[in-house]
């Protein structure tokens, strides 16, 4: 650019009409619009007043909603008019780049830093090259670096402006902590502002302004995040920076274990939001993750490293010398958590779980019985060898109903194999532990590993060990011969509760329990019964099983029925007693006789079966010709059983008609 004399031409006519104020207003408009040619022409038409007009002061309506004293250079710097700024600073000494004409005492650098334009970085570079001083304050004592406004369209310009104008945040503490390990510091308080990544990676300027972290008064009500329940694995994984803070006053967020509005360390509850420890690829992009809280990936380093599958699964490099307030890693072998491969959750470390204050844990809702506890990780830890058996027994008691084998889960062909395996196992229980065989099921019968024959003994042993009825000194004698009958009773009771179809009692009329017939779907088909066509479900069968056993507790036949189970080849006699049938027909309470089920036809079937004990009489009954020719009926008892079943089915058919 040439000097001002190169722009001045001798006008052929007098200057344009209008006063000096109007001409300065026109120059300010041209400077705001970055009209280089128009500004050059306006200065040329000014003649001898061109120098005064180039550095003249006019009134400009700014952001303060008032007229402010501004020069064309200051207006051009505010709106990022790099062409006009280059023209004006090239005029030599005619334009003062450090001039402060207004009452606010702002310079051209103040206007460029607070303008928020896309070309703010280029304008600041032109002003600094022309001799602008970034250490000149305004009337309020603010430097150009204190009034920086980042352009919304280019957030990276913030760091460049800070470097050019000499502003540098004091990140020494955070940088030293982050460089020593992969565990980042806690998010800063809102007074520290937001900073882009480019501001941390840029180099230091010779002129630095050290502004440390805001000091807060000592708050004794803030909990210590490194002691008590706040340092436990349970709180760190499921409550740290998850629960909102209830304090309504300003305090240090880095010392508070709860989350605050707008905090970067905010986490989702892994018990309510099923996400993994894998970082989300869209979280750091402009606009954030479109899935929001429903995303299956972690949002931020705190969600990733405090996830139950990641927290304290590795050893810290500093070990016991670690000085971080919140560390994501274990500092010794006792704090190390072992996560199973088939589980998305983690296991509590022995030291952390034993050091939890139970009163505080109950208040925070971290105990297993708390209503707010929705997540229950498996309690067995490989590192906790001393209490692993008791924890495993406690877990098995809660999951037995979910993991036990059910008869309706198997095919019809597999029921015979199940009966054969059960008889072998009951026989093996009567043998000494050293000589017990290990029966195996066929590959076609799919039973979950939780009740495999190899660990069924341990399951019931741990169950009895956890019961208050068995003291600790009797833990080794649970499988003595004195406890065999109690164990067999427990096996059959659990089988009757878990299976809606009792496979051991469905093929013989001797196994017909009158109470079960009264409540069975076959008994409901009879028009004599008030329970006609009542739908049945597995739940009703399980609930009704203990009720059907109550009337026969004191029965002599029932009390001696287990006498023949001791042998592997023993057969249980589930025959129907006529006295029990009489008691069933008799009303239990006055006024309820009309609700009792009529089972008189069952007694008639049993009496017919006892009278027709001879083969000649059996042959005379209808529907038995096909049964007589079967080669698999070896004795008279089996033939009699099949005959009674046929008569029973015919009676049911007649009842339906």
Curated annotation (Swiss-Prot):
Residues 549-562 have a biased composition (Polar residues). InterPro entries: Ankyrin_rpt, Ankyrin_rpt-contain_sf, Unkempt-like, Znf_CCCH, Znf_CCCH_sf. It comes from the Eukaryota. Residues 176-222, 507-566 are annotated as: Disordered. Gene3D superfamilies: 3.30.1370.210, Ankyrin repeat-containing domain. Pfam families: Ank_2 (PF12796), zf-CCCH (PF00642), zf-CCCH_AtC3H23 (PF25512). A zinc finger (C3H1-type) spans 274-302, 311-333. PROSITE patterns: ANK_REP_REGION, ANK_REPEAT, ZF_C3H1. One of its GO terms (biological process) is regulation of gene expression. ANK repeats lie at residues 68-97, 104-136. Keywords: ANK repeat, DNA-binding, Metal-binding, Repeat, Zinc, Zinc-finger. Residues 176-206 have a biased composition (Low complexity). GO terms for molecular function: DNA binding; zinc ion binding. This is Zinc finger CCCH domain-containing protein 50.
